[in-house]
């Protein structure tokens, strides 16, 4: 179905004249154009707002169940095309949020990934195979295995990082056949499941920490108990506020009637990140969860009390440890590390430690995990940017930030092998045979990397690269495996279509590099550009007529005619600018030069504007405004006045277009969203004839006639967000960069 958007006609047009060329200020820090702000390649910079701001509409919460409602719409569409094939990487990994060893099957390890589903290993974590249906949400929060081999999985990530957005889940699931099939068993309105605890003496008795929706109050929050293997549930501990959920439930290893629950008061509002509150705290039950008492001896209720992590020593359950985050609403700093020797009746705050504090940075809510050696009550590991370890009960600490990836989230000891420990972090799965004190071995096969972008070469179908969440910019030359060649959060990646060794890669906030030797050596070129603001994902593009001509978008558009060595601004500020409200908008998000007219360039912005110039930036005309975040502009190769625009944003209660086309240079627009799911469209590609390909949060879709009638494209692609698609018409292939399942390829 097509809709004509008459409201966005000529009346919206505005003409701006480009300013004279400005030299980059050599004293400005690279990356943001803002004095004093520099984002390091690796280190303690807080997770950005980028993904939350992109997926929501200004002033609105992310609607409850928006993701799974859109997924249901996608499932109803017919499918066309062949099978998608995994391109990789499989050796890099991605964020692991929980893990569990199967008591009934030795050496069988299950891991839950942030947006890549559930996986199983039977070879000491060396390789992993999917243990989760491809057509269910891939956003996971928890996994647990009962003594009889029954598996429980909680959906929805409980860690609110990764761009300040988590994909909500659809509740709790159970499998009795090692993950071959799964059955939903309730708590569908939980938003995210933080932890599942199964009574080691009774596999029918389990507790679930329902963390709740990050974006909406209420729902299934708190601690739930089932005495019949998940057939029915009772909430046994509710939060003190409607934004308080549970993050963890712990059994006393010697007495399963004695339990502890950690509660966290938090919410991501449209213009505020509230990650602390009066509802945060630790509770204890001595009667199997029937009643609970708050442990005020640890910390008193407070508006600035953040996320807490607790560990119990299996060899001495009276000894406990707690790490506490505290701070203003938008951040949690390290408050302190506490220990108890009487089962939580009283607590002592241990002396401050610089390594421990630095490991939590300004976002202690990203970690909040304490793991105690089952055989040594003084040997403790703590999650942080690095892995922190004490061997004397917290009196001194060492930080391991060399032998594994940053950002630790999960750990489990193998009960059959006393010194074997598994660790999960933003780089995947690691194993240590030294009790977690070094000697970490990374998994060889874990294809669940979160991609922001992809790049391919029409000259060589064995060359791919892409930017990833917390795993840098990755490359695969000749299908000989993948490696990181630029660090940080990888963003834009490009491969020159006429020279496979001329590649470009960026990390966050437009810190970009060019290379003429395939990325072996890289030259930082951002200081040569001119911008006051740069997006977390700053667009860089080749001109389709000449790859020596390039474009770089900050709040102004920059142009290079020497393959990115020197740059000249060719526009004024094309955004509404910052500071009008609490939203840090004001950057260009997409650039498209016309193949049929090298003087015509289209630009989209994060504050919903689309501009066009037909004279290489001498003047600019506003052709669309008041829209959600513009994710892509694609220009018809044969007509500079025909442009396709894709929009982000989940909306509740009313229709939101996500694909628009103009055939008259932006004087009028037609809605081509048609039967697409009501969800963000992240990219659009023009295929042969009138064919359109769209990448969305629910996969890839095709409109054969370009008329708004869409079908799901291909089989075998999991239900995972696809942030970028690349088309190689000469080899008839489409490559999808997914946010959670690495890259896939489809022959079309």
Regions inferred by a protein language model and the residue ranges of each:
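Positively charged n-region of N-terminal signal peptides that target proteins for export
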Residues: 1-4
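Bacterial N-terminal signal peptides
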Residues: 7-17
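Beta-propeller blade termini and top-face loops
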Residues: 26-748
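C-terminal region of N-terminal signal peptides and the immediate post-cleavage residues
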Residues: 15-25
């Amino acid at each position: 179905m097509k809709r004509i958007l008459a409201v966005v006609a000529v009346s919206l047009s505005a003409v701006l004249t480009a300013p004279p060329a400005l030299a980059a200020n050599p004293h400005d820090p690279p990356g943001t154009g803002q004095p004093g702000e520099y984002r390091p390649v690796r280190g303690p910079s807080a997770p950005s707002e980028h993904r939350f701001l992109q997926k929501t509409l200004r002033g609105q919460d992310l609607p409850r169940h928006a993701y799974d409602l859109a997924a249901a719409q996608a499932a109803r569409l017919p499918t066309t095309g062949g099978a998608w094939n995994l391109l990789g990487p499989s050796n890099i990994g991605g964020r692991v949020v929980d893990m569990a060893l199967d008591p009934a099957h030795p050496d069988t390890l299950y891991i839950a990934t942030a947006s890549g589903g559930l996986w199983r290993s039977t070879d000491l974590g060396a390789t992993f195979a999917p243990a989760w249906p491809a057509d269910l949400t891939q956003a996971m929060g928890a996994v647990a295995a009962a003594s009889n081999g029954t598996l429980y999985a909680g959906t929805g990530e409980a860690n609110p990082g990764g761009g300040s957005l988590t994909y909500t889940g659809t509740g709790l699931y159970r499998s009795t056949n090692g993950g071959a099939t799964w059955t939903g068993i309730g708590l569908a309105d939980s938003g995210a499941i933080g932890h599942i605890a199964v009574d080691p003496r009774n596999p029918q008795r389990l507790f679930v920490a329902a963390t709740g929706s990050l974006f909406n109050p209420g729902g299934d929050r708190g601690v739930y108990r089932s005495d019949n293997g998940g057939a029915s549930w009772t909430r046994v501990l509710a939060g003190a506020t409607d934004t308080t959920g549970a993050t963890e439930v712990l059994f006393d290893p010697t007495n399963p009637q004695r339990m502890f629950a950690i509660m966290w008061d938090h919410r991501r509002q449209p213009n505020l990140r509230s990650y602390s509150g009066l509802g945060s705290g630790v509770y204890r039950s001595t009667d199997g969860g029937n009643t609970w008492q708050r442990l005020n001896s640890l910390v008193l209720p407070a508006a600035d009390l953040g996320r807490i992590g607790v560990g119990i020593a299996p060899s001495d359950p009276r000894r406990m440890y707690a790490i506490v985050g505290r701070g203003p609403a938008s951040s949690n700093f390290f408050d302190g590390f506490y220990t108890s020797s009487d089962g939580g009746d009283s607590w002592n705050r241990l002396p401050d430690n610089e390594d421990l504090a630095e490991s939590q940075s300004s976002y202690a809510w990203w970690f909040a995990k304490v793991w105690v050696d089952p055989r040594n009550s003084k040997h403790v590991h703590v999650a942080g940017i690095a892995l922190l370890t004490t061997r004397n009960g917290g009196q001194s600490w060492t930080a391991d930030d060399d032998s594994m990836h940053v950002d630790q989230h999960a750990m489990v000891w193998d009960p059959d092998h006393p010194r074997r420990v598994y660790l999960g972090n933003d780089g995947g799965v690691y194993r240590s045979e030294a009790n977690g004190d070094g000697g970490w071995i990374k998994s060889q096969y874990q294809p669940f990397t979160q991609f922001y972008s992809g790049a391919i070469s029409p000259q060589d179908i064995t060359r791919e690269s892409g930017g990833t969440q917390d795993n840098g910019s990755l490359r695969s030359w000749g299908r000989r495996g993948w490696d990181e060649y630029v660090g940080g959060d990888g963003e834009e990646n490009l491969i020159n279509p006429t020279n496979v060794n001329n590649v470009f890669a960026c990390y966050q906030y437009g810190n970009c590099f060019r290379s003429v030797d395939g990325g072996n050596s890289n030259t930082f070129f951002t200081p040569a550009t001119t911008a006051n603001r740069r997006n977390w994902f700053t667009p860089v593009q080749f001109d389709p007529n000449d790859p020596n001509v390039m474009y770089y978008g900050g709040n102004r558009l920059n142009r290079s005619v020497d393959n990115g060595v020197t740059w000249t601004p060719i526009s004024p500020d094309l955004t509404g600018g910052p500071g009008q409200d609490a939203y840090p908008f004001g950057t260009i998000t997409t650039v498209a030069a016309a193949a049929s007219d090298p003087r015509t360039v289209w630009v989209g912005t994060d504050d919903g504007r689309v501009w066009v110039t037909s004279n290489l930036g001498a003047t600019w005309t506003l052709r669309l405004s008041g829209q959600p975040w513009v994710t892509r502009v694609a220009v018809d190769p044969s007509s500079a006045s025909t442009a396709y625009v894709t929009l982000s944003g989940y909306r509740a209660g009313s229709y939101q277009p996500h694909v628009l086309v103009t055939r008259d240079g932006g004087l009028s627009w037609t809605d081509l969203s048609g039967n697409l799911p009501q969800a963000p469209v992240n990219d659009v590609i023009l295929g042969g004839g009138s064919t359109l390909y769209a990448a969305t949060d629910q996969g890839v879709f095709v409109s054969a006639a370009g008329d708004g009638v869409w079908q799901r494209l291909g089989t075998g692609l999991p239900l995972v967000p696809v942030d970028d698609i690349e088309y190689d018409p000469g080899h008839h292939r489409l490559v999808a960069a997914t946010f959670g399942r690495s890259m896939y390829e489809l022959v079309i």
